[in-house]
Every structure is written in structure tokens, then in C-alpha cells.
Amino acid sequence: MIHRLKTILFMSLVLLFSCSGPSKEQQEKLDTQAQLEKDLEMYKYVWERFFEGDTSIVNDKYFTEDVVVVTDQGDLVGVEAVKNFYLNYFLGFSDAEFTIVDAFGQGDKIVKYWNFKGVHTGDFFGIPASGNKLDLSGTTLVSIKDGKISREQDFFDMMSLLNQLQQTSGDVTVDAQNQGVL
């Protein structure tokens, strides 16, 4: 009888603790993962809307007030500076296509692998229109703070970009794996 009571007590305790939910550490990991998924969804949404032509999406709802875009000419700080920086893609290119090929993250960091295509029909960061097609892939490192974009830094092959925009005719190397023709 005592053995049976011990068994029932043991089973009751096992059942009680197994139903109590995740530990504090497990819950923190679940919360962090849920926040990351929410941040990734927001990030993709913002850039899809922007490249659909809704430049008003670059605002303080999605970007921190002191958002930073790191460039080789110095950091750009603030929502308006970021919006003006990315507007160069609209001013410099027609038939623009921006694709987020992949995006993933960990904690408050996101990595975006992207592709940009367009026809160079306007001034692009001081490079006059050439009429050339651009097909450029790159990666962006992103920091998120309190559910908002707080920092971006793009990495791409600048030589490929310049070759494509300044080439007068013939073959252009888009990247090491693909050939483009003007």
C-alpha cells in the first residue's frame, strides 16, 4: 500500500512539473526567437513596401530616431538622411527590381542577402545616367533596437557596380558566377 502511494505521489509530481511550462531560461529563448521572427517580418515588409514606391515607410514607426546607415563616405544618421540615401535608387534607376533573396538573424541582428536590378537612367550618387542595366547582389548587416531598424551596413562588389554603370558595350561581369551583357 505504501509503495502504491509513493508511486501515485511520484506520478502526480511528474505530471504537475511537466505541465508547469518552460523554465525561465527556456521562456527567454522562446521570447527572443519570437521577437526575432517579428523583427524579420517587419524588416522584410518595410523594404518590400519601399521598393514598391512607398518611401513614406521610412519613418519613426519602423526606424529609430537615430538610425545609422554606414557608408564609405561616413555614417548617415536619422530617418530623413536614411530616406534620402535610399531615394538615390529611385532617382538613378528605372525598371528597378529589389529582391530580398534571404534574410535571417540572431538576437537583435539580421543579415539580408539581396539583389537589385534596374536601368541606369538618372544620376546615381553623382554618376550620370548611362542607360546601362545593373544587376547587383549584396548583403546588409542590420541591427534592431526595440523592434525598430537602428543600423544598416551594405556590402557589395563596388567594382562590379562601377563596371556595369560605366561600361560602354560588350560583356560585363555581374559577379564571379554570372556574366551579363550590355
Regions found by a protein language model. Name each.
Residues 8-17:
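Bacterial N-terminal signal peptides
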Residues 19-61, 172-182:
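Short, low-complexity N-terminal intrinsically disordered segments enriched in polar/charged residues
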Residues 56-107:
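A solvent-exposed, acidic/Ser-Thr-rich amphipathic alpha-helical stretch
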